[in-house]
């Protein structure tokens, strides 16, 4: 799946953008995903990982 964190499963969220007149327009908030090289099952792979997962140490870059 594209644009989904392989560690935490974080992905884009949807909601409404509200104008001053409170008109609603659909929009998306993307997760802060970084494409990094990590070792998974002994192989080096390039995967999308959220910045929060990187900062918390759930995954380590290669």
Curated annotation (Swiss-Prot):
Tell me, which GO biological process terms does this entry list? translation
Q: Which SUPFAM superfamilies match?
A: L28p-like
Stored InterPro entries = Bacterial_rp_bL28, Ribosomal_bL28, Ribosomal_bL28/bL31-like_sf, Ribosomal_bL28_bact-type, Ribosomal_bL28_sf
- Gene Ontology molecular function terms on file: structural constituent of ribosome
Query: Could you give one GO CC term from the UniProt record?
Result: ribonucleoprotein complex
Keyword annotations of the record:
Ribonucleoprotein, Ribosomal protein
Q: Where is this region: Disordered?
A: 1-28
UniProt family annotation? Belongs to the bacterial ribosomal protein bL28 family.
| Cross-referenced NCBIfam families | L28 (TIGR00009)
Which PANTHER family does the record match to this protein?
Answer: 50S RIBOSOMAL PROTEIN L28, LARGE RIBOSOMAL SUBUNIT PROTEIN BL28A
This chain belongs to which protein, by name? Large ribosomal subunit protein bL28
Give the organism the record lists: Bacillus anthracis
